[in-house]
Amino acid sequence: RRVAENTKNLKVFCTYMDTLRPGRGCADILPEGVKDAGAIGVMINHCEKPMSLPQMKLTIDRARELDMLVFACADTLDEAKAIAQLHPDIINPEPSEIIGGGKGASPMAYVMDSIRAIKEVDPSIMVEQAAGITNGQQVYDFIMAGSEAAGAASGIMNAADPIAMIDEMIAATRRAADDLK
């Protein structure tokens, strides 16, 4: 909650929530609790917490009941297309084998194919590319290829100077936005 209350431009997402309703549910993550804690959305289907399509649908429906955004991860193009049919707000199509940095970023052909596949199902879904991003140039290249956002958790945390890497990636995002005008 403190992060959400003390930042102007940072949007807080929960990394998972269950679909239960207030009442019984020991050890479950209550959606209302997630929202009350300051999250505006929920991440679903990360490779470290995979979900079935029916479970994703239930989670998206619960998030919608609470006016929360949904950020979905997809491991393959086929999974990205299937998840797009559930209409989350954002899809991050990232092959799980390259998540965590050090193994290279998503190939540009995959980036472009995944954007196209998702937009063919639902043009309103924002596509974020993230797997394996380790520098600002990759952020710039992915945005110039059509990605609407870029993520880089391990690329930042594993950098020699994480603050400098954040600055580099933000500058690359700004440069791409300016170049696309």
Say what each PLM segment does.
Residues 6-13, 35-42, 86-92, 143-150:
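Glycine-enriched alpha-helix->loop->beta-strand junction motifs that scaffold or abut catalytic
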Residues 8-63:
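Glycine/small-residue-rich loop that forms an oxyanion/phosphate-binding "nest" at active or ligand-binding sites
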Residues 12-15, 42-44, 70-72, 91-93, ...:
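Hydrophobic faces of well-ordered beta-strands that scaffold small-molecule active sites
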Residues 40-51, 91-103, 145-166:
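Glycine-rich phosphate-binding active-site loops on the catalytic face of alpha/beta enzymes
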Residues 59-63, 105-108, 155-181:
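C-terminal helical cap(s) of enzyme catalytic domains, especially alpha/beta-barrels
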Residues 69, 73-122, 128-129, 133:
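Active-site rim beta-loop-alpha module in soluble metabolic enzymes
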